[in-house]
Amino acid sequence: MAASEAAAAAGSAALAAGARAVPAATTGAAAAASGPWVPPGPRLRGSRPRPAGATQQPAVPAPPAGELIQPSVSELSRAVRTNILCTVRGCGKILPNSPALNMHLVKSHRLQDGIVNPTIRKDLKTGPKFYCCPIEGCPRGPERPFSQFSLVKQHFMKMHAEKKHKCSKCSNSYGTEWDLKRHAEDCGKTFRCTCGCPYASRTALQSHIYRTGHEIPAEHRDPPSKKRKMENCAQNQKLSNKTIESLNNQPIPRPDTQELEASEIKLEPSFEDSCGSNTDKQTLTTPPRYPQKLLLPKPKVALVKLPVMQFSVMPVFVPTADSSAQPVVLGVDQGSATGAVHLMPLSVGTLILGLDSEACSLKESLPLFKIANPIAGEPISTGVQVNFGKSPSNPLQELGNTCQKNSISSINVQTDLSYASQNFIPSAQWATADSSVSSCSQTDLSFDSQVSLPISVHTQTFLPSSKVTSSIAAQTDAFMDTCFQSGGVSRETQTSGIESPTDDHVQMDQAGMCGDIFESVHSSYNVATGNIISNSLVAETVTHSLLPQNEPKTLNQDIEKSAPIINFSAQNSMLPSQNMTDNQTQTIDLLSDLENILSSNLPAQTLDHRSLLSDTNPGPDTQLPSGPAQNPGIDFDIEEFFSASNIQTQTEESELSTMTTEPVLESLDIETQTDFLLADTSAQSYGCRGNSNFLGLEMFDTQTQTDLNFFLDSSPHLPLGSILKHSSFSVSTDSSDTETQTEGVSTAKNIPALESKVQLNSTETQTMSSGFETLGSLFFTSNETQTAMDDFLLADLAWNTMESQFSSVETQTSAEPHTVSNF
């Protein structure tokens, strides 16, 4: 303690005399050397300088001469500034030290004036600078200077500055807080050498080892800083190990094998495999190998990639078996072709390929459903998606044969057939009486020739499990585009039927359900839509319209008498060629006169009847005629006649409770809305493509709503298919109560927008039928009709006239109830 106080007193005395003593010595040394300051020659550490004449040492190259700087005591005792706030107003940045502040001021604010120790680039030509301690008698004087200012400051603060920081354990004092902290780490510890000599600090131990050459102990080899780093790393490693252990205790989510494999599924095209009784054939993917716990809910829809579908533009989404998603069809317009995204309701899909644009037929006729156990049937969903096309031909090459030659540019068909019934076995009855058939199809047919006819059909059926229900929704958009005329045909049909189940059983022949859809199509198209058959309608084999038409199967007459069947079919003929009459010979003819006009006065060129829904269909190897055999074609002069029709038909079938248990009640609700547009080819078309030099335009709007309620079980068969076969221009009803109301509205005869007169007509017909069965053969019939027609239905109408006449006929008929005993 006394030594430290004496050293402090000597230091204070040196501080008092050092300011003038050191410069004097430096000046004297410089004057004696008569040149720049040169540091003394090298000597051993801890040795004292010896006189020059005492020993002769070899000449050693002198270090380069430099500038010797002796800083003042106040400059060395100045505290180091930390966390310095930038002096520029509004900056607010805090710098860790003064050099960082100077760098910030120069680089960020471009300020160099008033900076303490500004950053100046060192001149390479100037010599090095040396810094010596200002305390007189200090060994780190001019003879042993420091190369950096920080080193001389550290020396001064450690050896000569006031020791303000004291240790609480050993009462030692230190000039800086950092020195006290370093001492606290080693305070009270004993550093023992391998020879057994103890030391109070690691530094003293290192000095002993350096002098004696002993081996340093392993626990003291690493410096304290490195030990601290190693301890921190070990602590962090422990924390990480604990975290990993806690995570290992929890279940780790793993990727679902089913989801990963679902994108690579290839659906089998065989109905027999998809209808097998084994459950493994009805699952899309294999079950996971081990149980898995998902953090997120499992998705309900899986995307099925079908790489073999080369021409398809409609992706198919197949939900899982336990999915509650509803079937959805989304249409996407992709230019000329119409795409769709179809969500199939169940988990089994089938893809059928092998289509050709000319002779469109599938690979082979699909086999029948063969199941060993007729009772253990499971729900099966089959999806058929077909798209095939051909490059369009040049329209200029087909000016002479417009009606005889048409090429397919794009055909896109998507079908979904769901069978929730039991089994499909020929010549056998089903085990239960519940059956349901759901079909959803979309067709895009476009013809690149003089007559362009794209057609889009959408069909959807909803069937509950308790009753046999059939619903068909069809929408057809047909457009005709030639170099001389243009027109548009739009048809929308929706049918809903509900039938009460009875004891009768249904037997269906599903042979070749989808195999022969396009089997007999060459340049013409003949696709027949069949019946939606329920178990309360027939009890014998029923013809399915998708079968080849050269092998038709008819119904038994006895069965037809016992249980009526509703047959829906349609023909795309624009106008009917004959009248429709049912078993009761009650007919409503709307366009019979117009038909005669078109068939007699326009024989110039024949319009090719592309029968999409026809009754007669030759074999697959036989070329179809230009028109149906049973219906003569209607001649049109394409250059003089233009026809476009927009037909929207909505049909709903509802079930009425019967008063007796034996008869089966059937109800039919038909609502038809027709927009019929007739114009000369030289007249201007509204909303259609064509020339702008039209001379005459006539419009006819017809809206018909018909409600047909119950057909008794004893009544003869009502061929509704024949009714709808001729474009719904003639309607035959067999109902007890009929009410028809027709309104016709005509616009002014002179319209300044056209060169000639334009006549607009609107006809609306509403028919309601209802009845009640009392004695089994008694009908109460009441008919009321009101009609308004225009003169274009007359036989003497000329299409090329500049003026047209208007005539209105209103008829109202009321029939009293009467009794009918025999049908």
Curated annotation (Swiss-Prot):
GO-annotated cellular components: nuclear body; nucleus
Tissue-by-tissue expression: Ubiquitously expressed in normal tissues and cancer cell lines with highest levels in placenta and skeletal muscle.
Annotated segments matching region Disordered: 28-67, 214-234, 268-289, 610-634
Subunit structure: Interacts via its C-terminus with ATM. Interacts with DYNLL1; this interaction inhibits ATMIN transcriptional activity and hence may play a role in a feedback loop whereby DYNLL1 inhibits transactivation of its own promoter by ATMIN.
Cellular compartments annotated: Nucleus
Pfam families hit by this protein: C2H2_ASCIZ (PF24757), C2H2_ASCIZ_4th (PF24761), C2HC_ASCIZ (PF24759)
InterPro entries found in the cross-reference section: ATMIN (IPR055303), C2H2_ASCIZ_1st_2nd (IPR056545), Znf_C2H2_ASCIZ_4th (IPR056380), Znf_C2H2_type (IPR013087), Znf_C2HC_ASCIZ_3rd (IPR056381)
Organism of provenance: Homo sapiens (Human)
UniProt gene name: ATMIN
GO molecular function, one term: DNA-binding transcription factor activity, RNA polymerase II-specific
The protein's name in its UniProt record: ATM interactor
PROSITE patterns named in the record: ZINC_FINGER_C2H2_1
